From Swiss-Prot:
Residues 1-26 form the signal peptide. One of its GO terms (molecular function) is signaling receptor binding. This is Butyrophilin subfamily 1 member A1. It holds the Pfam family C2-set_3. The gene is BTN1A1. Glycans are attached at residues 55, 215.
């Protein structure tokens, strides 16, 4: 009878241990990357390793290497299969997974035929169930250029110009000139210009006036590789002419004539520049008037846009009027719906457009990251599908201190100033979507001749949390007190426009040469 309690205790202990086993499989882990940057030479292969701590198997985990954004990524593997559709075009077909030690939690991504554009920071991301971690891997790309070549040119003044040229360097190399005694001296001018592959072509020139410098060498160094290439040239003594009194007299006369010529050219140039400036200012004023006419006519097609809560990502909080939205760290408990975004922090407008022209404005304020535009009603809302026109998105964004049009290769937008309010104009029949900076009325970007099929809806996205929301502006903000000036040269000819977009009595021909201006400064389009 004394043995029974011990047997019961042992059985209970065994059951407790077995219950803990499933928890061990999904235990938390850390991802560790290399402490030092990975150095790779252009044209060769590079491996970006990461490992798990503790050393548990990475089989079956989601493995992702990416750069600035999670998607599209450099490499994605899910359940042991590469997901090429989620990879960046410039890496597709050049990356593979090195999984020799995957059972010990050590894996790497191999990049074949490294390019200069591959240089920079990468992140490796491991996910298993609800547990995920990431680490940073730095890749340093280097290329040793061609042997330098020195060309020699004797100038009319008797000075000798040497130009040292070499191609195929990365990153930008250092150029140094030396005398035959090993004394270093700087270049008179240098240029380092990248080619289509991102490799630098180096040109450096010097002027030699001292006839004792018979041998001169040009040395180009790659500081990252710690290697250099050098070439030496000998300057014949006959290249240094001897000065005579008559040569000095001729030189003085030439200098005087040169100064007189320069003075005459200078005054002629100033007169030409002044006249050119006047013509340019007149042309610029007309161009600005026409550009203002485009977006102010767009406001005549203004629509009242509101946010659709059924499409909002759980981290997006909509205001009661459905006009403003902000991103929060906390996740709301919302019903799962097929029309709700579950990965990208986005929300659609309630309004769906299948024809006609439509215009609305969004107050972005001083927020540092957002995306605004139009999307098809049936776009993929689950997962990280790239936001491109091919996938049904036509949008512009502010991300990483830069403005971009979300084309397949992301088009940079060189704006004169940051817009605090953005206007969006959709012309369904022509397939055009225009974006305007309503701070100064300038044009931002246009998606032209798009092929629309089915309903289109306004689209909004936030990339970071913040107290300041993204706000859809009321329709009346841009329509009060708008006037048309029939002739840009005569501002006294003002013709009012109907807020509903009806042309005035002057007709369409007169409107083509009109400028929309606010009746009062406080009533214009912001």
């Amino acid at each position: 009878m004394a043995v029974f309690p011990n047997s019961c205790l042992a059985g209970c202990l065994l059951i407790f241990i077995l219950l803990q086993l499933p928890k061990l499989d999904s235990a938390p882990f850390d991802v560790i990357g290399p402490q030092e940057p990975i150095l790779a030479v252009v044209g060769e292969d590079a491996e970006l390793p990461c490992r798990l701590s503790p050393n548990v198997s990475a089989k079956g985990m989601e493995l992702r290497w990416f750069r600035e954004k999670v998607s599209p990524a450099v490499f994605v593997s899910r359940e042991g299969q590469e997901q090429e559709g989620e990879e960046m075009a410039e890496y597709r077909g050049r990356v593979s997974l090195v999984e020799d030690h995957i059972a010990e939690g050590s894996v790497a991504v191999r990049i074949q035929e490294v390019k200069a554009s591959d240089d920079g920071e990468y992140r490796c991301f491991f996910r298993q169930d609800e547990n995920y971690e990431e680490a940073i891997v730095h890749l340093k790309v280097a290329a040793l250029g061609s042997d330098p070549h020195i060309s020699m040119k004797v100038q009319e003044s008797g000075e000798i110009q040497l130009e040292c040229t070499s191609v195929g360097w990365y990153p930008e190399p250092q150029v140094q000139w030396r005398t035959h005694r090993g004394e270093e001296f700087p270049s008179m001018s240098e240029s380092r210009n990248p080619d289509e592959e991102g490799l630098f072509t180096v040109r450096a020139s010097v002027i030699i006036r001292d006839s004792s410098m018979k041998n001169v060498s040009c040395c180009i160094r790659n500081l990252l590789l710690g290697q250099e290439k050098e070439v030496e040239v000998s300057i014949p003594a006959s290249f240094f002419p001897r000065l005579t009194p008559w040569m000095v007299a001729v030189a003085v006369i030439l200098v005087v004539l040169g100064l007189l010529t320069i003075g005459s050219i200078f005054f002629t140039w100033r007169l030409y520049k002044e006249r050119s400036r006047q013509r340019r200012n007149e042309f610029s004023s007309k161009e600005k008037l026409l550009e203002e006419l485009k977006w102010k006519r767009a406001t005549l097609h203004a629509v009242d846009v509101t946010l659709d809560p059924d499409t909002a990502h759980p981290h997006l909080f909509l205001y009661e009027d459905s006009k403003s939205v902000r991103l929060e760290d906390s996740r709301q408990k919302l019903p799962e719906k097929p029309e709700r975004f579950d990965s990208w922090p986005c929300v659609m407008g309630r309004e769906a457009f299948t024809s006609g022209r439509h215009y609305w404005e969004v107050e972005v304020g001083d927020r540092t990251d957002w995306a605004i535009g139009v999307c098809r009603e049936n776009v993929m809302k689950k997962g990280f599908d790239p936001m491109t026109p091919e996938n049904g998105f036509w949008a512009v964004e502010l991300y990483g201190n830069g403005y971009w049009a979300l084309t397949p290769l992301r088009t940079p937008l060189p704006l004169a100033g940051p817009p605090r309010r953005v206007g969006v104009f959709l012309d369904y029949e022509s397939g055009d979507i225009f974006f305007y900076n309503m701070t100064d009325g300038s044009h931002i970007y246009t998606f032209s001749k798009a092929s629309f099929s089915g309903p289109l809806r306004p689209f909004f996205c936030l990339w970071s949390c913040g107290k300041k929301p993204l706000t859809i502006c009321p329709v009346t903000d841009g329509l009060e007190g708008v006037m048309v000036v029939a002739d840009a040269k005569d501002i006294s000819k003002e013709i009012p426009l109907s807020p509903m977009g009806e042309d005035s009595a002057s007709g369409d021909i007169e409107t083509l040469h009109s400028k929309l201006i606010p009746l009062q400064p406080s009533q214009g389009v912001p």
